[in-house]
Amino acid sequence: MRISIFGLGYVGAVCAGCLSARGHDVVGVDISSTKIDLINNGKSPIVEPGLEELLQKGLATGKLRGTTDFAEAIRATDLSMICVGTPSKKNGDLELDYIESVCREIGYVLRDKNTRHTIVVRSTVLPGTVANVVIPILEDCSGKKAGVDFGVAVNPEFLRESTAIKDYDLPPMTVIGEFDKASGDVLQSLYEELDAPIIRKDIAVAEMIKYTCNVWHATKVTFANEIGNIAKAVGVDGREVMDVVCQDKALNLSQYYMRPGFAFGGSCLPKDVRALTYRAGSLDVDAPLLNSLMRSNTSQVQNAFDMVASYDTRKVALLGLSFKAGTDDLRESPLVELAEMLIGKGFDLSIFDSNVEYARVHGANKDYIESKIPHVSSLLNSDFDQVINDSDVIILGNRDERFRSLANKTPEGKRVIDLVGFMTNATTEDGRAEGICW
């Protein structure tokens, strides 16, 4: 494949070396003549183990060259990768000047280019950047239509400095965000030789995946550091603790808790978060990430309330009251908190939860229900159909399987708010179901 790479920093230089070494015809483009001279002399413009050897191989086989001539590079290739920097502004937003400049250069050349060209954004950009910045510039400068006259895609990179060559050759996954199917097909053919799953998504999803991965890595580092600081303060080696924590692949390092949805609750998590952060505070150990957990959890309950309040009705059904399906435990259930907020604001609330209904009459939680939340328990109704029929808005609160069908086939005249992820897609055909995080 004939590929031009714009920006020969850490991402662009590595891509140029790896792609040319795999037999692709690569033109590296940069405004810095110093970088171009280095590339053309087989020298790496960055410090990266193994890269110089790849660049030299590309030069020796005639598969790699560098230039400062943007137009010539675009005319000589079929696919352009944008790898320029997107540094932070003082306010934290991204500086997109380099992206915009490259897009203008590409667009002007495309105006007179008769063959199809695919533009791939590898630079890290926020969701909406390609749709609202990249494509409009390309279309305006070229006078052509994205997805028709030229292709557009996003291909986020997951390269770490000092291990970038290995990361390129052995990626955990290859993410392709495609504006048009043809562009996705082109990129898939480029990466099929790599032993990694190829995941094709919409462009905005791909943009968000990159940020989610990086923020998750930052969160893990911060979490481990805060746990380590607290552990040290109580006389424990935090490394020993985290080593054992990371051995649990069923829960600790798994997909189990990594699903967007409603707040956490129950008798353990809230209590233990409060206890550990209290101990940290008593030892003068700063743990801002851990201290934010309960506040963030409460915010998610508020989000659910706001969704209900956005509808012009007061008749609401809450399906599920315990913090998870299959239990009658109401201790610190976020659904109880949501119910109390709705009651306090005058909503006409009906609640269905077969486990809690049984517990109210027979279970060990009877005293808890009657003494702690009698105002909530009095709204429980064991007639599922009546609860549905008497409501205008239906909240799917836990993963009781009998609630699933309501998410994808909303009853006539009703609205559904899905807190648990029963909806198959982010939207339904009738548009009457809405997810809290989708």
UniProtKB/Swiss-Prot annotation:
Residues that coordinate or bind NAD(+): 10-11, 30, 35, 86, 124, 271, 331
Q: In which pathway does it act?
A: Glycan biosynthesis; alginate biosynthesis
Molecular-function annotations in GO: GDP-mannose 6-dehydrogenase activity; NAD binding
Induction behaviour: By oxidative compounds such as H(2)O(2).
Q: Which UniProt keywords apply?
A: Alginate biosynthesis, NAD, Oxidoreductase
- Can you tell me which residues bind GDP-alpha-D-mannuronate? 161, 210, 214, 217, 225, 256-257, 259, 262, 265, 324
Report the EC code(s) recorded for this entry.
Answer: 1.1.1.132
Q: Which residues form the active site?
A: 268
* InterPro entries reported for this sequence: 6-PGluconate_DH-like_C_sf, GDPman_DH, NAD(P)-bd_dom_sf, UDP-Glc/GDP-Man, UDP-Glc/GDP-Man_DH_C, UDP-Glc/GDP-Man_DH_C_sf, UDP-Glc/GDP-Man_DH_dimer, UDP-Glc/GDP-Man_DH_N
The chemistry this enzyme catalyses reads: GDP-alpha-D-mannose + 2 NAD(+) + H2O = GDP-alpha-D-mannuronate + 2 NADH + 3 H(+)
Look up the record and give one Gene Ontology term from the biological process aspect.
Answer: alginic acid biosynthetic process
The family line of this record is: Belongs to the UDP-glucose/GDP-mannose dehydrogenase family.
Q: What does this protein do?
A: Catalyzes the oxidation of guanosine diphospho-D-mannose (GDP-D-mannose) to GDP-D-mannuronic acid, a precursor for alginate polymerization. The alginate layer causes a mucoid phenotype and provides a protective barrier against host immune defenses and antibiotics.
The protein, known as: GDP-mannose 6-dehydrogenase
Which organism encodes this protein? Pseudomonas syringae pv. tomato (strain ATCC BAA-871 / DC3000)
Q: What is the lineage of its organism?
A: Bacteria, Pseudomonadati, Pseudomonadota, Gammaproteobacteria, Pseudomonadales
